[in-house]
Amino acid sequence: MRVGIDLLEIARITRIAAHSGGRRIVFSTAELAYADTLGAVRCTEYLAGRFCAKEATAKALGRGLGQGLTWREIEVLADAHGAPQVLLSGGARTVAEQAGIGRIDLSLSHQGGLVVCVAVALPREAPAPASPCEAPAPASPCTDPHGTSPGRTAGAPS
């Protein structure tokens, strides 16, 4: 497992969000198509989140952007439930495959003019997360894994 994190002031993305040339270098057609459906403030927040997610993903891949990865090769779109999802292509996909990475999970949050993203790169053979409803029941506080009973020390006479 590899982890990448990035923190960004949303205001730093304002120039990129307003400049069509910069937008096309950093963001995919699908990312921009969705951003263009939003109002100006929300568009900037959305693009800042995607920028931050791309940075965190590159860190989780163990590379900086420009070191075998380009911005548009890391695409961040929403799944059916609105959660951010990473799609890799080109050099980014090659780097992930060579590192044995099967998927990258993201967590994004916006607060007070900042956006933070954590990217967790999981090995190809990593199972899907178990439902919290299916987690094994915790051991009873009265059950001792060493075969002793509460109030009795291992090896002490009964």
Report each predicted region and the residues it spans.
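Core catalytic alpha/beta fold that binds nucleotide/phospho-ligands
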Residues: 1-158
